[in-house]
Amino acid sequence: WGERRMVPIAGGTFEGPGLKGKVLPGGADRQLIRRDGARSLDAVYELQTHDGVIISVRNKVLVRPPKDGGARYAFSTLEIVAPEGRYGWLNDHVHVGTLDSLRPERAAVVIRVFRLI
């Protein structure tokens, strides 16, 4: 199929409607770099909200290089598990996302997450 890699998740921050906090270090992004140039990513990590609540995330991403001058394809599905209470609503929706690299300036990504209703 291709080359496998594991990239550690060193941390970061997140913010959105009703949520903000930090991405905790210790997660990992397992990657399969396919022979056709596409990448299949499976990232597992935890978030800590500004008020101390831990939320678990599994983000599965497909990244395809641009074809015929088009844009790069980088979309994901996210499984988000939060404890009951203030953030319990996260458990009751389907979430999708986009992924943008910040290279060459930083070895980091921006993930935009959308809740489907």
Question: How should these model regions be labeled?
Answer:
Residues W1-I117:
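Beta-strand-enriched cores of mature, soluble protein domains
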